């Protein structure tokens, strides 16, 4: 057998490759020491070396049958969780995950040693430590569909935080499509017909779901819709698009972009929302009394993290395993009325 095959490697095969008994492999995997257990260091190192070479990861269900329940939940983020630009996305999620783990009496293990390839962390690598956790929560705007498919094929207990297209991967997500269509529909009912959508440059499901919501609301109408990729790094180009296209409504996927454009519009003498309405398809958890009250989506990310933990706990349970419908669920996304949307006072400001 090749030591680099991608299918699941069994403990029996590990034992054959290392020239030891299957019981020895089990003892090494579970770090059993003390008492009458005596495994020479050379033997232990040989078993660990084969484990690394074959990319072996223990089946969590087998670990539970063997009485190994660490009460540890792993957390893997495809993007760094703590840089300032990521805080608004990850902080409420991690708060919810922490609260859920506390309710269950479990500890959290954040996987940080994974390699970065093409700007993205890789879940599978030669020093994979997934076996240290009973189950794993996956976080990220974009996830590798090949890795998700492999997790499913190899029977890992995982839950993705956010909707995923990959078949059979359990997830708890937010229904961005319905909420986006609803809030944009409100704007159209007020009379907006020239709409500019500033969207993120990402193929993540949540990004595509918001875009689909915009399309659902504006299709089969007389709305003139323009869209532009924007992460807020080129405010001048964003503003130039506004002055050229002359929309009465700007939809900004990023709350930071919405804030920057609001400030620029006010500086240029625009009355928001009379001259220019702005909708944000997200919310910042860092709110102060002086902040603009945007008409916006308010994703329940703390609840999302907590619900994902609960689903993972049920996947690990022998008594409360979720039904097929419960394995992939979407939470409704609240809409904040705010103060940046009103009927246009004219077709468009030149």
Model-derived regions: residue spans:
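N-terminal helix-turn-helix DNA-binding module of bacterial transcription factors
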Residues: 1-68
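Hinge/beta->alpha junction and helix N-cap segments in small-molecule ligand-binding domains
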Residues: 80-92, 110-120, 172-182, 198-238, ...
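Flexible loop/turn connectors
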Residues: 237-350
């Amino acid at each position: 057998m090749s030591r680099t095959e991608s299918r699941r490697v069994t403990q029996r095969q590990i034992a054959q490759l290392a020239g030891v008994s299957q019981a020895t492999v089990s003892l090494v995997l579970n770090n059993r020491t003390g008492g009458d257990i005596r495994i020479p260091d050379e033997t232990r190192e040989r078993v660990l070396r084969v484990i690394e070479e074959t990319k072996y990861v223990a089946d969590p269900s087998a670990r539970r049958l063997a009485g190994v329940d660490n009460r540890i939940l792993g957390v893997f983020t495809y993007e760094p969780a703590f840089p300032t630009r990521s805080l608004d996305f990850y902080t409420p999620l991690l708060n919810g995950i922490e609260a859920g783990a506390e309710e269950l009496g479990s500890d959290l293990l954040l996987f940080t040693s994974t390699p970065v390839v093409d700007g993205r962390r890789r879940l599978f690598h030669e020093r994979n430590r997934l076996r240290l956790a009973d189950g794993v929560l996956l976080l990220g705007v974009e996830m590798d569909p090949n890795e998700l498919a492999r997790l499913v094929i190899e029977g890992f207990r995982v839950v993705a935080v956010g909707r995923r297209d990959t078949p059979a991967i359990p997830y708890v997500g937010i229904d961005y499509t319905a909420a986006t269509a609803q809030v944009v529909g409100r704007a159209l009912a007020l009379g907006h017909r020239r709409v500019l959508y500033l969207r993120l440059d990402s193929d993540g499901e949540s990004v595509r779901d918001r875009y689909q919501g915009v399309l659902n609301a504006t299709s089969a109408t007389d709305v003139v819709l323009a869209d532009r990729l924007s992460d807020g790094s080129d405010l001048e180009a964003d503003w130039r698009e506004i002055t050229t296209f002359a929309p009465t409504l700007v939809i900004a996927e990023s709350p930071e972009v919405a804030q920057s454009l609001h400030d620029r519009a006010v500086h240029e003498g625009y009355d928001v929302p009379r001259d220019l309405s702005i909708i944000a398809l997200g919310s910042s958890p860092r709110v102060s009394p002086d902040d603009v009250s945007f008409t916006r989506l308010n994703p329940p990310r703390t609840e999302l993290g907590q619900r994902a933990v609960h689903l993972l706990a049920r996947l690990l349970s022998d008594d409360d395993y979720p039904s097929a419908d419960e394995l992939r669920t979407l939470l409704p996304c609240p809409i904040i009325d705010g103060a940046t949307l009103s009927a246009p006072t004219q077709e468009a400001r030149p």
